[in-house]
Amino acid sequence: MKARKGQSSWRFYKNAWIFLEESKENLLSEEEAKSILKEKGLMVRNTYDFDTKDNTSFWFIIKDKLEDISELPASTRTKIRKALKIYNIRRIELDELESVAYEIISSAEKTYKIKESSTSSLDYVSLFERFRERDNCECWCVENKTNGEIVGFSINYVKADSCDYDYIKCKDEAIHNSSYPFYGLFYTMNQYYLGEKKLKYVCDGSRSVTEHSNIQPFLEHNFKFRKAYCKLKIHYKWWLGVVVKLFFPFR
């Protein structure tokens, strides 16, 4: 995911330009979109009117209120406490994380409901190179207190008043052995960014098409994340726009 020159809030991802400051994004004019697409890419994903009261077809999953642990569901509280007895949730440098993350990613990908191509060793190197290119990345890990094994991690992108939980993985066996690593990880990060750092909100991304990991419903149910609705306009490269109109004339 690379930044657009001169526009640090834009990132290029899978042939599309995406604005990372979702709460500050405005509706682009056709000329502005064309200017962005002159560089490269097939489309610009333009979201605007962030956190509108209208229930639109697109949203971001955010948490903007930090409640006491007693306000979370009883089962969630139990799992958080068990996770924190088993695991040390701590900050970790990107270089240290890179040395252990490949095994975690490979294990996590086996559990996805919708199978995508697995992350190869070359993809892995490229992935961490992209993270190094980004400013304000912070990494967290889930470390077993007994043997020191790192079973999960999160790579976050910290912005002026919010934080994106950008890339999160956990070993399949740790998820299914009743040690609840995700519960400890999300609880600790929420406490840090919303409580200690006083950010306005944390975000786990936008509407998922594949929902291969069920992470967004998990966060809504267990940690009181919510949908921040917004409006969406896709600006296409001119020739792709023609194709889209031919095949989907009423959209």
What positions do the PLM features span?
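A conserved beta-strand-loop-helix scaffold within acyl/acetyltransferase catalytic domains
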Residues: 1-12, 47-52, 62-176, 193
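Terminal substrate-recognition subdomain of acyl/acetyltransferases
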Residues: 1-27, 34-43, 48-86, 201, ...
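Well-ordered, non-membrane alpha-helical segments in soluble/globular domains
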Residues: 26-34, 121-127, 182-188
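Short alpha-helical interface elements
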Residues: 105-108, 126-133, 181, 217-218, ...
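Aromatic (often tryptophan-rich) hydrophobic motifs at membrane interfaces
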Residues: 136-242
